[in-house]
Design a protein with these regions (language model features):
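Conserved coupling/switch loops of ABC nucleotide-binding domains, chiefly the family-specific signature
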Residues: 58-61, 111, 211, 346
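The feature captures the beta-strand-to-loop junction immediately N-terminal to the Walker
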Residues: 37-39
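ABC ATPase nucleotide-binding domains
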Residues: 74-231
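Non-catalytic connector elements of ABC transporters
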Residues: 239-241, 251-357
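Pre-Walker A (P-loop) beta-loop-beta motif of ABC nucleotide-binding domains
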Residues: 24-35
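A short, flexible loop at the N-terminus of ABC-type nucleotide-binding domains that lies
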Residues: 2-3, 11-23, 72-76
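Helix-to-loop junction immediately C-terminal to a conserved catalytic motif
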Residues: 52
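Conserved ABC transporter NBD signature motif
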Residues: 60-68
Length: 357
């Protein structure tokens, strides 16, 4: 087990003027599961590959424990990777696939067999040890890939979107399985995903990246409750946060004639700016007779919850507003709702910098 550190780590691909990863400073604590999350091109997989030794580090350094591994060959770093593709050998059975890295490391046969037996039992794979990958389901193949990493007993697990090939139901199950396994083993883990639901449900902390730069690093709850900037606010949360520019005067916003009093802690700074980006989670909009008029375009009913996707005449023109509604009595398409933000659920951002006030 080991602490992992990126210290100003930068990667610029040949022929590009932009850094794929730009001066990343990040410490992953021993035994922690940290999730790197962001859209395509954010630098999350580049960071993982640099940690594994599969990408060059153009400047800065990378550490595993007390060892600077910046220029160390991948095979000497003692990390195990799990990929989106299971990368199993089709002609080997499950036991041989799991034992393969131990065989390459010249681990004695008796020890190989004992490690495979122990890990197979842990991952509920014992009855499949004699089967070939083609005889397994997607979830079982992913567990075999996990088992092959676990038997190595590495300093860290590096997981690159390992659940992307699974259907929705299996992803939910495997999210819980991976999180439980990591807690049980206590192995430092870096997990890469574009799926913010995976990030929120699995990580002890999450690192949100965009265009190669770290936007925010904190617990899932803290990132959701206090997004550092407009990008994080719009990326983390499903459905996404509503973001609306509004003018401010005397400590209040004006939304199409509806006056919204700002929290006292933010009112002076917002008034000084004169204009802010107002962030509203869908569950922070409540029905009110004096609220903003919003026409229902679509209702997304997911059973326990329902969301109305509405059009509203807001500053800057007609905008989309998403509001959580009563799933037992959802509104009809074309119906007009009156919605008012909950004052203590407002998020305020500087429109020039995008940073949180």
């Amino acid at each position: 087990m080991a602490e992992l550190r990126f210290e100003g780590a930068t990667r610029i691909y040949p022929g590009s003027d932009e850094a794929a990863l730009d001066s990343l400073d990040l410490k992953v604590d021993d035994r922690e599961l940290i999730v790197l999350v962001g859209p395509s091109g954010s630098g999350k997989t580049t960071a993982l590959r640099m940690l594994a030794g599969l990408e060059d580090v153009d400047s800065g350094s990378i550490w595993i424990g007390d060892t600077d591994v910046t220029y160390m060959p991948p095979k000497e770093r003692d990390v195990a990777m799990v990929f989106q593709s299971y990368a199993l050998y089709p002609y080997l059975d499950v036991a041989a696939n799991m034992a393969f890295p131990l065989k390459m490391a010249r681990v004695p046969k008796a020890e190989r067999e004992e490690r495979v037996r122990r890990v197979a039992e842990m991952l509920e794979l014992t009855e499949y040890l004699g089967r070939k990958p083609s005889q397994l389901s997607g979830g079982q193949r992913q567990r075999v890939a996990m088992g092959r990493a676990v038997v190595r007993e590495p300093k860290a697990f590096l997981m690159d979107e390992p659940l992307s090939n699974l259907d929705a139901k299996l992803r939910v199950q495997m999210r819980a399985d991976i999180a439980a396994l990591q807690q049980r083993l206590g192995v430092t883990t870096v997990y890469v995903t574009h799926d913010q639901v995976e990030a929120m449900t699995m990580g002890h902390r999450i690192a949100v990246l965009r265009d190669g730069r770290l936007q925010q690093l904190d617990t899932p709850r803290a990132v959701y409750a206090r997004p550092a900037n407009v990008f994080v606010a719009g990326f983390i949360g499903s459905p996404a946060m509503n973001l609306v520019e509004a003018e401010v005067s005397d400590g209040a916003c004006d939304l199409s004639g509806v006056r919204i009093e700002l929290p006292a802690a933010f009112a002076p700074a917002a008034t000084k700016l004169g204009r802010v980006v107002l962030g509203l989670r869908p569950d922070a909009l409540e029905p009110a007779a004096d609220g903003v008029a919003a026409r229902v375009d679509v209702v997304e009913d997911v059973g326990a919850e329902a969301y109305a996707f509405c059009s509203a005449d807001l500053p800057g023109g007609e905008r989309r507003l998403i509001a959580r509604v009563d799933s037992r009595r959802p509104p009809e398409q074309g119906e007009t709702l009156r919605l008012r933000p909950l004052a203590d659920e407002l998020h305020l951002f500087d429109p020039a910098t995008g940073e949180r006030l």
